[in-house]
Structures are given as C-alpha cells and as structure tokens.
From Swiss-Prot:
Residues 28-334 are lumenal. It comes from Rattus norvegicus. This is Galactosylgalactosylxylosylprotein 3-beta-glucuronosyltransferase 1. The gene is B3gat1. Pathway: Protein modification; protein glycosylation. CDD domains: GlcAT-I.
C-alpha cells in the first residue's frame, strides 16, 4: 500500500503537466472558435465568393442581433407639394374582422405618398375601435359616419330593391369633398373608392395619380371570373367591357376599377351614387354616367392588361364557442 508521502509526490508531478496541457489545448482552438469582427466593418458576414447574397444564411450571432432590433412603426412618406393627393374613400361597418381588414389596408396606405384616407362608418356614431386605429396609423385621415336605415339594407336577395352596402357612406364622402374644397379649386387630386376587404398593389396608386378625368383598370375575382377588364382597342381607347354579367351596362366595371379626378367631382355637384331605382351591378354606372362618356375613359395598368387590385374577402370566422363558460373576455378588442 503506497504511503501518503508517495501519493503527494505523484500529485505534485501530474498536476503541473495537466495544467500545461489544458492551457495549450485552449490556445490552439481559440482561433477556430472566435468570431472575428474588424473595427468599422458591417456586423453581417459577407457571402462566400460566388454565392448569391440573397440566399446566404447568416450566422447565429447575426440572427440574435437582428432579433434584438427594436421595432419602429413606419409613418407615411413626407408630403410632396408637387404630387396630386389621392383621396381614398373607404366605407366600413362593425363585424368581427373589421379591425383586421382596416389594419391590413392601413399597412398598404402607409407606403403611398400624398394620401388622404376618408373612412366612413355605417353607424349612428364614430366607434372607438375605428377612431383609435386611425389615430395610431399616423395617416392623414378624415373619420365620418352615417347609418344606413334598416329598411334600406340588403337582405341577400339579388331582386331586393334595397340599396347596396356602402352607398350612403360613399355619398357622404362625396358631399364632404364638395363642402371642403371650393368648386373652382385648383388643388390637384384623385378620388378612389376602396373597400376595406380588397387587396391593393402599391403600383395601382401611382397609376391613378395622373388621372385627368376618369381612369380605369382590371379587377380580379369579380363577376364569377378570374378578372373583369375594360376592352381597349389598338388606339388605346376603351370600347367595351370584358365581363359576363350584363356587359351592356353603361360602365360594366367594379367599384375598385376606376378613379375620378377631384376637379370633376367638384364641378359635377349633382353626381352621386343613386339610392333608389338602380339594379344590382349598376351602382358604378349611376355615378360615372353623370361624369363622363365611354370615350373619356383613360385605360391604366398597361392598357388594362395588368392586375393591380384583387376583390378578396376575409373568411367569416367561426365563433360557435364564443360566450361558453366565460372562456374569452368580451372586452378584449379584436
């Protein structure tokens, strides 16, 4: 059995060598483990030679740095004194997906310079939900309201003589514009009727900005078709309509498929959407026939060959379990 003195001697001999080997091992691996970062260099690593920088995967260190970046809410572009103002008229009404629809639309409009959002609620008063949402966006907006009388509202029957949803709200916006701007106003502007459930390309707003009288373009997912569009001849003039539903309408076009010069709206003070005696699909014609003829229309979107707006609709949420056993708090705004 080894003596205690012998064990101590072995420990004193082995311990220094163990420490030396450990230090040497760490110093030899350090260059391989270290992340080099030169002063003044971009914290993101450059892609290897020949690699597509858009497909190059950054290191874990870079990903962590991106996650730590604080979110900054985007505000609209600076106002320009040279660009015409686009007045976007949006009727809206209370429903479970209203805030989601308006939020999505606001996120699009935030990228459009010189834009004024005219939001008109179908309600007896302006609702706090819509008021807060508009205020928080930072957009240039006007918040109006007018309630459609119950006996005017559609009941889902195409033969029902009641007016289509949004008619009174769009008319209130037209009245507001005429009361705000004098009839002989020289301020350049364009009026566009944009529902809150559609999807809009940013290119669409730049296309309509140069509207002299009334500009037109295709709209996707309407009339039971992939898209409806004005029919344009070789001379760049609108001569008809590519649609199945009643193609002989004066203006067989969807509400999202045209924009009107502000001066024309101000000068033709009698032009409104008709409340009575208008068949389904004729609301657009009831306004446009008071403003222009077919020959006056200006085809946009590459002579009406590009799709820049989609008549999308959010699926109605199934809330069959709502209110059972107090599972959710009804005071939480959605």
């Amino acid at each position: 059995m080894p003596k205690r003195r012998d064990i101590l001697a072995i420990v004193l001999i082995v311990l220094p060598w163990t420490l030396l080997i450990t230090v040497w091992h760490q110093s030899s691996l350090a260059p391989l483990l270290a992340v080099h970062k030169d002063e003044g260099s971009d914290p993101r690593h450059e892609a290897p030679p020949g690699a597509d920088p858009r497909e190059y995967c950054m290191s874990d260190r870079d990903i962590v740095e991106v996650v730590r970046t604080e979110y900054v809410y985007t505000r609209p572009p600076p106002w320009s004194d040279t660009l015409p103002t686009i007045h976007v008229v949006t009727p809206t009404y209370s429903r479970p997906v209203q805030k989601a629809e308006l939020t999505r639309m606001a996120n699009t409009l935030l990228h459009v310079p010189n834009l004024h959002w005219l939001v008109v609620e179908d309600a007896p008063r302006r609702t706090p939900l819509t008021a807060r949402l508009l205020r928080d966006t930072g957009l240039n907006y006007t918040h109006l309201h007018v309630e459609t009388p119950r006996n005017y509202k559609l009941r889902g029957d195409a033969r029902d003589p009641r007016i289509p949803r949004g008619t009174m709200q769009r008319n209130l916006a037209l009245r507001w514009l005429r009361e705000t701007f004098p009839r002989n106003s020289t301020q350049p502007g364009v009026v566009y009727f944009a529902d809150d459930d559609n999807t809009y390309s940013l290119e669409l707003f730049e296309e309509m900005r140069s509207t002299r009288r009334v500009s037109v373009w295709p709209v996707a997912f309407v009339g039971g078709l992939r898209y409806e569009a004005p029919r344009v001849n070789g001379a760049g003039k609108v001569v008809g309509w590519k649609t199945v539903f009643d193609p002989h309408r004066p203006f067989a076009i969807d509400m999202a498929g045209f924009a009107v010069n502000l001066r024309l709206i101000l000068q033709r003070s009698q032009a409104y959407f008709k409340l009575r005696g208008v068949k389904g699909g004729y609301q657009e014609s009831s306004l446009l026939r008071e403003l222009v003829t077919l020959n006056d229309l200006e085809p946009k979107a590459a002579n009406c060959t590009k799709i820049l707006v989609w008549h999308t609709r959010t699926e109605k949420p199934v809330l069959v379990n709502e209110g059972k056993k107090g599972f959710t708090d009804p005071s939480v705004e959605i």
